Amino acid sequence: MKNLVILSGAGISAESGIKTFRDADGLWEGHDIMEVASPYGWKKNPQKVLDFYNQRRRQLFEVYPNKAHKALAELEKHYQVHIITQNVDDLHERAGSSRILHLHGELLSVRSEKDPNLVYRWEKDLNLGDLAKDKSQLRPDIVWFGEAVPLLKEAISLVKQAHLLIIIGTSLQVYPAASLYTHASKDTLIYYIDPKAKNARLPQNIQCINESAVHAMQDLMPKLIEMAS
C-alpha cells in the first residue's frame, strides 16, 4: 500500500460546528491568546485557562465527525494512512481513523504540570485541586504557544515517507506545522484543500483545491481510490 499522509487543521472540524480561532467568529474572540493558551496565562490565572478548556471539552460532546472525517477514515482501505492533525478534538478517532498524531495535544487528555509524561484521559471538567500521581496540579494536555512541539520529529518523518500528502482545513499560518509539507519528497503528490487555498503562496507543484473539506473530499475520493490501485 502507498503511504498517504494527511495534515489536517481547524477547517475540517469547523464543518462539524467547532469554531476556528482564526476566523472572525472564533473561540478566541474576547480572549487574549496568551491569557488562555500559554505558560504565562497558566501561571497568571490557571482558573481562567481551565474554564476556557472546560468549555471546549464540553463542546466535543455536542459535535460529530462530518463527511470529510469519514472519507479520510475510508481511505485506510486503500492506503497506509497517517493523520497528522493540528486539531485537539477527537473527530478523526470517532470517524474511524486509526493512526492519528495530535501535534498540538488533545482536549480529552490532561497531564501533570511538572511531568509531561504523566498523562490521563479526561472527559469531565478539570478543576484546581485535581492532582496527578506526582501530587502536582493537572493541566490541559495541550501544546501552548511558546512550548515545544514534542511530536514534531515524528511528524516530519511521516511526511518524508509519504507518496501522497493531503493538506486539509489549515490556513498554513501556525508554525512549525505550516512548514511540514516542505519535508515531502520532490516526487510526492500534494493536494492543498481550503476555501482560500488559491490565495496561499505555495510551490507550483502543489495542487490547490479551493473548496471546503467536505465538498473537496467528495470530489476527490474517486481519483484517490483510483490512484491507490
Please give the residue ranges for each predicted region.
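Conserved catalytic core of sirtuin-type NAD+-dependent deacylases
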Residues: 1-229
